[in-house]
Amino acid sequence: MSDLERNYYDALNLTIAQHPSESLDRMMAKLLAFCINAKAGLVFTKGLSSVEEPDIWIRSLDEQTSLWIDVGEPSPDRVKKASRQAGKVKVYSFNSKSDVWWEQGRSKFAILNVSIFRFDSQSVKTFSALVERTMDLSITITGDSAFIATGSGECEVAWEPLQVV
């Protein structure tokens, strides 16, 4: 993994479990969000199995949450609760319907200390089509996009910052 914006380079060995109710697109959006924010202490949580936790977070030894990352289209109430519990909150939406979600919640999100990004939904689908049970992939992040190369193909996934704090 190479993040040219942050000068962050790492070889990550990740095991990602797909929840039975989780789409492949969501799982891959979650992987992208992880890579975009990769740093020491960043871990996947129980995800959809635990509504009290985000998809990804950083917690300190005293169990304080310094970074809370949700993937999808969480309700404004969930984001508000997260912003009270964590030092920094980020949301990555990825669905084709995320435009509607953003327009409906925009005014409520505007008053919260949260950064919101929207992945290009078609690019996420293209990335999902490359998934294999066991795979090696290379991710290079520059600006607001990630170039992904796998044994079965390559693609680029871009994202748009909707609100950055």
Task: Please describe what each predicted stretch is.
Residues I56-I58, T65-V79:
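Conserved catalytic cores of phosphodiester-cleaving nucleases, focusing on short active-site segments
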Residues D3-L48:
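Acidic-basic catalytic patches of nuclease active cores, encompassing PD-(D/E)XK
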